[in-house]
Amino acid sequence: SYSELIKLPYSRLPKLFAVKALDAVVFNVPVDPLRPVDKRDNYVKRCMGLPGDTIRIVDRQVYNDQRLMTLPDRSNGQFSYYVRTNGQGFNPGQIKRDFDINYLKNSQVNNQNVSDVLQITQTEFIVTIPEQALEAFSAMMHVDTVIVINALASHQFSEGTPEALIWYYNQAVKPMPMYPNPMGGHSDTTEYAWTRDNYGPLWLPSKGSTISLTRDHVLKYRRSIEIYEGHEFREVNGSYFIDDEPATSYTFEMDYYWMMGDNRHNSWDSRYWGPVPEDHVMGKPVFTFMSWDKYAKGMDKIRMDRLFTVVHGKGKPTSYLLVFLALVALYYGWEIWHKRKQSRQ
């Protein structure tokens, strides 16, 4: 990882289980070209699309081959909302305790610490709210209006849209180019007028599938051909060349997956850098040993209800912490008894 002079072949252990739709998945982030695949940052996102599927997002809802993808029980879906109050602000401690919303001071906000609350005017805020807390949050006495933020492909707003919401959209949402538009581009000049809330359709390549090399396909899949599958790709006078050979089609060598975060409006995921190739997938998280809330105080930093829980499954997760502590106590009890027995002998 310190030099490009020596490159060892990249090999992987065979997989034990296949990735399924809606699984939480651990993978190496694809957009980190300066480091080898296995040295790139590990991300955990939810698989919303499998190889061969077609992904489309309509009004924040994800569709896979026209089937609505509903998040499982143990997910934590969140969106950002425009919130207007009667003039009273929010108490950071209260909304953290009641809704698990992190309201950080400006001095605390950086690339690693993002506040769930952005105050725009004296009475107007952008708030990221967990779906299960939305109804209770909206019922707070001093909350007058709650509007979900839905970025339209047209970048247009209906009559009566609050000026503060338009300002936030133009400053924080609109400038973010969606894949397969160039990352250095701008939403006013992009090829695909897609947004984080209205996206696609985009087909996910599967191993062995073949596409014709049209302009649309080249824009969408050139990154897979060049970066992930390692072929030289050139366009000369409207004709395409792969590894210096004329090409009118391409057959994919890997499967690709669509990964998205449950916090849809604060997630760096496939909407921005495209499908994840199979050689970047590490596995699935199975068990939560420790869950740490860096924004809480004191012992509240440890999320006791999440310790020793199974990641996948139906209903609320069951903590096996007491079972673990009992096993530890039995082990040490046996150790003490065994040593005493040996000393007597």
Where are these regions (language model features)?
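Extended hydrophobic leader/signal-anchor segments used for secretion and membrane insertion
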Residues: S1-Q345
